[in-house]
Structure formats: structure tokens, C-alpha cells
């Protein structure tokens, strides 16, 4: 059979009915397909044409509208979704007719617009958009500044990510990338979660398909799946579909951002997406770049990350796409092209480390190598001063300095032995261990410790900083070790107790008594 050209780029179909769906990289609905493998040339329509939606008009006859203006609203899984003017429309149009409130199918015409040349444009609930073209249907794209709470202390306290920010998580096999992603997608303050499982092993994708529907959304108490879309492309699916899957996910995210929603997009893993780019480029006999990746790999990655962000829409509402990608470098080598180029464009870097995972210090994020460039943004500083307190960033920087100092002293103790360094050094080392055990380490399987709200994180931070500023009196290093182990135990018990409960305050009292035992009164 001959190939026919449609004259269209690879496009996705956008409309109500996409939430809680499982798609492949070309937006085929996987739940409608049978069998273990996808059959050749098998396509399914991504939306349900028969389902009826309750439409409420938002625009009036005679209104002047531009592309992606909100014309009406439908509710999907309690999430209000906007029906918008066609994204491809040029200039300004006038609303000629709009349907009254009622029940309609996605292919029914719900409005007719008249463009500047007098042509009528019928509008249904469906939009089509090419995946590789970024949607620029917003008024401006300011620098993001709002803290995105994830409930993970090592992220929120030490290296915060913002609403509309970009981050990436590199890490070798078995360091807990997926658990960390699950925690973020479950706990982060987002309206819509999109997961692109791109080039994952089939068993990992099955795990996502079986585990995600079971997760309960802590914000609403309902199933997390109700506001999630999963795009799955296992390693044995076609290379071209694997390349497209990440773009498909980003296009769906941009569609929801145009409605003024906060979207969290997770890609797991962008390395396999880059490998698909490499295979395509090699087959097309393009010039190979470093490690045989395409020459323009850095431009492709930065263009893609550039599509995320915080935007102001034409009606002054705001929407955002927060993008977190994992990178699985071969052999844990962080110097390969994908990691290097991602590092240039992503503003947050959460380095997962085999050594911390082996010591069971989860989440295994290395606090010294990881960073967040948002801490340096004056807009972010203003936001923190207004929403948390003025001294927050100073205290966070002090924590990082203490962790760095603790690491240096640990190396000295390793070389010189416990007796070879002064007792004060042991105190500095154990203060850094206290920060590690109480702030950085978190139990994802404990109901209370898994999610730490910002108010509680502030409380923990102030408590630990006060202990770090206290001077203690010890005679030898054994006393230091025993004393701080007791202290870590009490603080850990506090982390497992309900905030401000009787149990919590009991441990707080124990901690005060413990500090009073050894502290030198100023």
C-alpha cells in the first residue's frame, strides 16, 4: 500500500474525557486495545464520542474573542474544564451564537464564531494541535516564584521547586527515582498530573498502571487517578512513538495550562527519549554528535524544557506546567550528554546517590550536590518573606554549610580515627548527622512522616537550627555519639507523631530536658 500524506504534522486530539486515561505515545487509548502487544497499524480514537457532557456557557453573543478564549465549561471528575476558541484561529473573532446550558457530545457544535473576514467558524469541544509546536496562547510568561509544596523535606526545605519550575532527577538503578516521583505526584499541589512513562521496562509500566489507581489523593480524599493521565511507551514499542510520547504529554499539559490550571508533568525517563532521538537521527544518516546523539541534542532538550513554565493568560488568569524529568545515565555516569545538557536548562537538580541508598538514607538525594537556582531569584525571596518568614533562606543556607562541614569532618575522622580529631569536631559532625536524620530522611511508608506541610517544616527547621547554635559540654567522643543518638531518636519520634498532638508535645518536652542536660548556659 502507498503512504498517503495528510498535510498535517503529528497532532493530538484535545477535549474533555482525557483524565484517568492510559494512552500510548501516539495517543491511542490503551484500554480499548486487546492483547499483550499492539498490532501493526492499530489505532483507537482517544476520546469517547458517545459520552454526554453538561456544558455551561461562559461567553455571550457579541463578545470579542481570540484563540484559546474561554467559551464554556464542562466538569470532568469534579475538575472544571474550559471549552476554548480554536487555538489555530488568527486575530479576533466575534461570538455569533453560543449554545445554552445543557448536555452535549464532544462533536456537537457549541458555538459559532465570525472572524475578521466574515467567515463562520463552528466550535466543538475538540481541538487538534501538533505535538512539536509549543502553544503560545498566553499574554506573558513571567519568572516563576510561587513555592510548589511537595511535602518532601529535602526538596521543600533545602532545594525548593516552584510552580511552573523545571527539575530533573538523575540517579543510577535502584536509588528510588520512581518512589520519589510517586511521592511528588501524589503530594504536590497540582490540579492535573500527567505521567509520561517513556521507554520504561514493561514491568515498570505495569506497576504504574496497577499502583496509580490505588493511590488516594491526600488533598481531596478521592482517587488520584481522577486527575491523572498516563502516557506509556515501553521500550519495545516503536522508536518514533517513544520520541513522540514526551511531546504528546507536554501538549496535553499546555492544553490544561490554557484553562488556568496547575499541571505537574513527570517524564520517566528522558534518557530513553534521547536514545529514541539518537536512533531516529542515525537512521536518517544525520551527522552524529557526542556519544552518537544528534548534533542539536542541547537545542532539542532546552526547547522542550522551555515549554514548561508559569504563564499569565489573556484574561489575567494564571496557569503553570511544572516539569520534572528523571535521567537514568548509563552506569550512573553524570558526565554523559543528556545529563550535561539537561543540567544547563533545568533549574533544580536532585542527585540521587547509590551510596546514600545503600545506607538506607531515603530519599537518597545528595544534599550537597543537589541545588535549586530558584532560591537566588529575588521574586522567590519576596514570596518566601511574605508567606513563611524573613530568615528562612538564611537558615537554609546555614543548613547546607553545616552539611558540607560535616562531610569534610567525616572524611578526617575516617583517616585519623576517632581519637585523632578534637571533641569539637565530633560535635560538628553529629550536628550534621542530626540534620540528615531529622530533616533529610523521610519515611514514604509512614502516613504522617510521608507528607510534611510547610508549617511543620518551618517548625523542624527552627528546632534544628536552635540545637546547632547551642554549645554543649563533652569530655570525649563516646559521650558525643551517645548523646546525639538519643537526641536523633527523640526527634525521629516527633516526626512520626501528629503535629502539635499531645504525643508530639511530650517528645518536645523530652528534647528540652535532653538539651538542658549538656548545654553550656550562655
Question: What is the meaning of each model-derived region?
Answer:
Residues 1-39:
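N-terminal accessory targeting/assembly segments
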Residues 2, 8, 27, 70, ...:
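Short, surface-exposed secondary-structure boundary micro-motifs
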Residues 5-7, 25, 42, 48-50, ...:
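Residue-level signal for pocket-adjacent positions within structured domains
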Residues 33-76, 81-88, 93-95, 105-165, ...:
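P-loop NTPase nucleotide-binding/switch module
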Residues 157-158, 164-488, 500:
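P-loop NTPase catalytic core
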Residues 475-522:
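C-terminal amphipathic alpha-helical interaction region
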Amino acid at each position: 500500500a502507498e503512504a498517503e500524506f495528510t498535510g498535517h504534522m503529528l497532532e493530538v486530539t484535545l477535549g474533555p474525557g482525557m483524565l484517568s486515561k492510559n494512552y500510548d505515545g501516539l495517543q491511542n487509548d490503551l484500554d480499548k486495545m486487546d492483547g499483550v502487544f499492539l498490532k501493526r497499524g492499530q489505532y483507537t480514537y482517544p476520546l469517547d464520542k458517545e459520552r454526554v457532557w453538561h456544558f455551561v456557557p461562559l461567553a455571550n453573543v457579541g463578545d470579542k474573542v481570540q484563540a484559546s478564549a474561554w467559551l464554556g465549561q464542562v466538569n470532568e471528575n469534579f475538575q472544571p474544564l474550559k471549552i476554548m476558541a480554536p487555538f489555530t484561529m488568527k486575530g479576533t473573532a466575534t461570538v455569533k451564537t453560543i449554545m445554552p446550558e445543557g448536555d452535549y457530545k464532544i462533536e456537537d457544535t457549541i458555538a459559532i464564531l465570525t472572524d475578521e473576514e466574515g467567515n463562520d467558524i463552528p466550535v466543538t469541544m475538540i481541538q487538534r494541535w501538533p505535538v512539536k509546536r509549543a502553544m503560545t496562547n498566553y499574554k506573558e510568561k513571567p519568572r516563576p516564584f510561587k513555592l510548589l509544596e511537595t511535602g518532601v523535606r529535602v526538596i521543600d526545605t533545602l532545594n525548593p521547586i516552584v510552580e511552573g519550575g523545571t527539575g530533573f532527577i538523575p540517579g543510577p538503578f535502584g536509588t528510588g527515582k520512581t518512589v520519589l516521583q510517586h511521592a511528588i505526584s501524589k503530594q504536590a499541589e497540582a490540579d492535573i498530573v500527567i505521567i509520561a512513562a517513556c521507554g520504561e521496562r514493561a514491568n515498570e509500566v505495569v506497576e504504574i498502571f496497577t499502583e496509580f489507581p490505588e493511590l488516594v489523593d491526600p488533598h481531596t480524599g478521592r482517587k488520584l487517578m481522577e486527575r491523572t493521565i498516563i502516557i506509556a511507551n515501553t521500550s519495545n514499542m516503536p522508536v518514533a512513538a517513544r520520541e513522540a510520547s514526551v511531546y504528546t504529554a507536554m501538549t496535553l499539559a499546555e492544553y490544561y495550562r490554557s484553562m488556568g490550571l496547575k499541571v505537574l508533568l513527570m517524564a520517566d525517563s528522558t534518557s530513553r527519549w534521547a536514545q529514541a532521538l539518537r536512533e531516529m537521527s542515525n537512521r536518517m544518516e544525520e551527522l552524529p554528535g557526542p556519544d552518537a546523539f544528534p548534533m542539536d541534542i542541547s537545542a532539542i532538550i532546552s526547547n522542550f524544557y522551555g515549554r514548561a513554565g508559569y504563564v499569565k493568560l489573556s484574561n489575567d488568569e494564571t496557569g503553570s506546567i511544572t516539569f520534572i524529568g528523571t535521567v537514568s545515565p548509563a552506569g550512573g555516569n553524570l558526565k554523559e550528554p543528556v545529563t550535561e545538557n539537561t543540567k544547563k536548562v533545568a533549574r533544580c537538580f536532585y542527585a540521587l546517590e547509590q551510596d546514600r541508598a545503600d545506607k538506607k538514607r531515603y530519599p537518597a538525594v545528595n544534599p550537597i550536590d543537589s541545588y535549586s537556582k530558584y532560591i537566588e531569584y529575588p521574586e522567590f525571596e519576596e514570596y518566601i518573606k511574605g508567606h513563611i518568614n524573613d530568615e528562612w533562606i538564611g537558615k537554609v543556607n546555614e543548613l547546607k554549610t553545616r552539611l558540607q562541614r560535616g562531610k569534610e569532618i567525616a572524611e578526617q575522622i575516617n583517616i585519623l580515627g576517632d581519637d585523632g580529631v578534637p571533641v569539637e569536631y565530633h560535635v560538628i559532625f553529629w550536628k550534621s548527622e542530626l540534620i540528615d536524620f531529622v530533616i533529610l530522611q523521610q519515611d514514604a511508608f509512614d502516613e504522617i512522616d510521608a507528607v510534611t506541610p510547610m508549617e511543620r517544616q518551618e517548625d523542624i527547621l527552627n528546632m534544628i537550627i536552635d540545637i546547632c547554635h547551642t554549645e554543649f559540654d563533652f569530655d570525649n567522643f563516646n559521650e558525643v555519639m551517645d548523646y546525639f543518638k538519643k537526641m536523633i531518636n527523640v526527634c525521629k519520634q516527633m516526626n512520626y507523631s501528629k503535629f502539635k498532638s499531645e504525643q508530639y508535645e511530650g517528645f518536645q518536652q523530652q528534647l528540652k530536658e535532653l538539651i538542658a542536660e549538656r548545654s553550656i548556659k550562655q
